[in-house]
Amino acid sequence: MGVRKLKPVTNGTRHAVLYDFEEIEKLVRKGKEWVLLKKNQVEPEKSLLKWWHRAKGRSRQRGNITARHRGGGHKKLYRIIDFKRDKSLVPAKVVSIEYDPFRSARICLLHYADGEKRYIIWPEGLKVGDTVMSISWEDAEAGKPLPEIKPGNAMPLKYIPEGTIVHNIEFIPGKGGQIARAAGTWAQVLGRSTRKGYVLVRMPSGEVRMIHERCMATVGRVGLAEHELVKLGKAGRARWLGWRPHTRGTAMNPVDHPHGGGEGRTRGKHPESPWGWKTKGYKTRRGKKYSDQFIVTRRDGRPL
């Protein structure tokens, strides 16, 4: 499960390392029997699909480039993901693990006991047929039994034990998970903060931050940690994913880039962006930001 290296039969496959999709599977009922479908036999849940306007790196109004090196790519439908996990104390069965073209992680389809269907990000170790559950802040505070600490279960940070690996963490209570959603990412609950109502969490970057105890988080690490090993092998595969060529500034004219112009290949200029900003180590974060008060330790280990 994870990735496979292709045989070097062509230039495009010589260095390619791609997904093997072994984790993709779905449990469906055919007649009186349950059948497990694999790989390309698995189709998404139609009720959770929607068309998504793809800006392709351009503005809606005038079509100006707002994000360079984006555009084209294969057509795709957006899968509606439940990042809030706000369905409290209703058990759900994992029916499928599926591919999602909009993210590096896999997603899994849940069938709740009341008949509702939802997608969530697939955590490592969760299998088809397993049961997951979440609990809201109100139910937890009322003393109702907490779900087990196992991959896929979600609860407020206040009730997650110290040292637990989590993902899909909220920054603002009720807004939905924003942190640790990509393939293989995780964060760690470090314990209670000295500031009342907050919990210390180590971010994927290594930064230690205070997050409100009411924020939801899902237990476990995001699956498909092998994503970092993938090598596309050829430019065409990047185009299928919506990436366009990246032109060097030194290959441009002076009117197009600060590095442009000169007779032949020239060097000696300070690295700059196309808009004249200093790059390669230049700090772009605001010096005084509201959220600075929640950062306990920076990602390089130094206190803020």
UniProtKB/Swiss-Prot annotation:
Signal peptide annotation: none
InterPro entries named in the record: NA-bd_OB-fold, Rib_uL2_dom2, Ribosomal_uL2, Ribosomal_uL2_bac/org-type, Ribosomal_uL2_C, Ribosomal_uL2_CS, Ribosomal_uL2_dom3, Ribosomal_uL2_RNA-bd_dom
Alphabetized GO MF terms: RNA binding; rRNA binding; structural constituent of ribosome; transferase activity
Cellular component terms per the entry's GO annotation: large ribosomal subunit
Alphabetized UniProt keyword annotations: Ribonucleoprotein, Ribosomal protein, RNA-binding, rRNA-binding
Keyword Cell membrane: no
Region entry Disordered, spans: 246-282
UniProt biased composition (Basic and acidic residues): 256-272
Record-linked SUPFAM superfamilies: Nucleic acid-binding proteins (SSF50249), Translation proteins SH3-like domain (SSF50104)
Gene Ontology BP term (one): cytoplasmic translation
Xref: SMART domains: Ribosomal_L2, Ribosomal_L2_C
HAMAP family linked: Ribosomal_uL2_B
Quaternary structure (record): Part of the 50S ribosomal subunit. Forms a bridge to the 30S subunit in the 70S ribosome.
PANTHER family cross-referenced by the UniProt entry: LARGE RIBOSOMAL SUBUNIT PROTEIN UL2M, RIBOSOMAL PROTEIN L2
NCBIfam families per UniProt: rplB_bact (TIGR01171)
Family of the protein in this entry: Belongs to the universal ribosomal protein uL2 family.
Role played: One of the primary rRNA binding proteins. Required for association of the 30S and 50S subunits to form the 70S ribosome, for tRNA binding and peptide bond formation. It has been suggested to have peptidyltransferase activity; this is somewhat controversial. Makes several contacts with the 16S rRNA in the 70S ribosome.
Protein's recorded name: Large ribosomal subunit protein uL2
Organism: Aquifex aeolicus (strain VF5)
Gene transcribed to yield this protein: rplB
